[in-house]
C-alpha cells in the first residue's frame, strides 16, 4: 500500500525501504503503542499530501511538531482549528499584518497556504507529548533532507523560507541557484525582535512569484 498518494510517491517511495526508515518505523510503532505521540499517525505526512511536488512554490521549514494536545496536524507552524495560537504563530501573523495588512485570524489552521503551494514541512515529523525534540536523531532528518533534495533538483524555482538557525542549516542542501532562499531569525518570542519582525517575507514571496509569472499566495487566513 502506498503511503503517499500524489507525485511525492514517485520520488520518495524508495525511502520507505531503506534501512534507516525501517528502523524509524519500528521505533514509531513502539512509541505510538506506548506513549502519546503527536501528530496522529494519520496526519504525519500531511505536508506532502496537501502540497504535491509539482505544485510546491514555497517551502516554510519548521523543526518538530507542537507537543501539546490537539495542536499538531502535520503542517509546520499550523495548529488545528479551535486551538489557541502558539507564540511563534502569533508572531508570524503579526508580521503578516504589518507586511500585507492581513487581519490576525481567530485560528492557526494554515491549510489554505498548503493548498496554494506552500509546503509547510517540519524537519522531524513526530514528537512525544510534552517533550520537545524527543524524536530528533531517529531518522526523520534523513527523510526530510530527501524531500528538500527533491525540491532542489526541480527545474521550476522554489522559494525556501528558513527561519532560525535550525532551518538555516538546511541551506547546504539547496545547491541550485535557480531557487530563492529567504532567511530571518525564528518567529519565536526569544528571537522575533532580532530581525524576524520587519523581514516582510510574505510580500517578498509574492513579488518573486509575480516576477516568475506565477499566481501569488493569498496569505490571509479566514476566520472559522
Swiss-Prot record:
Subcellular locations according to the entry: Cytoplasm
**Enzyme Commission identifier(s):** 3.2.2.27
Active-site residues annotated for this sequence: 64
Q: Cellular component per GO? A: cytoplasm
Q: Which Pfam families match?
A: UDG
| Cited function | Excises uracil residues from the DNA which can arise as a result of misincorporation of dUMP residues by DNA polymerase or due to deamination of cytosine.
Its family remark reads: Belongs to the uracil-DNA glycosylase (UDG) superfamily. UNG family.
**Protein name (database record):** Uracil-DNA glycosylase
Gene name as annotated: ung
